[in-house]
Amino acid sequence: MVSVQTIATIVVKTFKIVLNIIILVLYRTGYNGEFLGVGGTWNLNEEKNPDAEIVASGVIVGYLIYTLVQIVTFLFGTTEHKRALSEIVMNFVGVFLWIAVGAVALHYWGGYQGEHQFQFVFAEKQVGLAVGALCVINGAIYLLDTALSVIHFTKEM
């Protein structure tokens, strides 16, 4: 019999995958079909920081792959993966990484000024703020998944 925690975990992981794909598409094509990025420079008159972009790309793509692998293991129906401490650690670290990437994006795009300095609404700014907000929301979902992972881990002990 499948437990309620297992079903909840599969639903949460599926939602994380969908949200992660949305973030990835916006991150990659949010600037009128071109690369949007998260910014990551503290001087808003400069170009985007490549270090922040590398970390953001790693978090977005890395956690997409990790979550896909985790959901595949759940779909196999075995219980071995539920006893693994690695899922708790990865989800816990994911909370901080997603919130950090979202905070950098919100900081950069919140102060963004486009080419026309007296225009206040820019499509890329709105998409950048959406990416930042979605990353923070994804961090909260990873916190929920961390709690579910702890429940699985303690229940199986």
Curated annotation (Swiss-Prot):
Major site of localization recorded for this protein: membrane
Topological domains annotated Extracellular: 28-53, 109-130
Keyword Membrane carried by entry: yes
Any one GO cellular component localisation term in the record: septate junction
Tissue: Expressed in midgut epithelium (at protein level).
Organism: Bombyx mori (Silk moth)
Chain ranges passing through the membrane: 7-27, 54-74, 88-108, 131-151
Function: Required for assembly of smooth septate junctions (sSJs). May be important for barrier function of the midgut epithelium.
UniProt membrane topology term: Multi-pass membrane protein
Keywords: Cell junction, Cell membrane, Membrane, Transmembrane, Transmembrane helix
GO biological process: septate junction assembly
UniProt name for this protein: Protein snakeskin
Keyword rRNA processing on entry: no
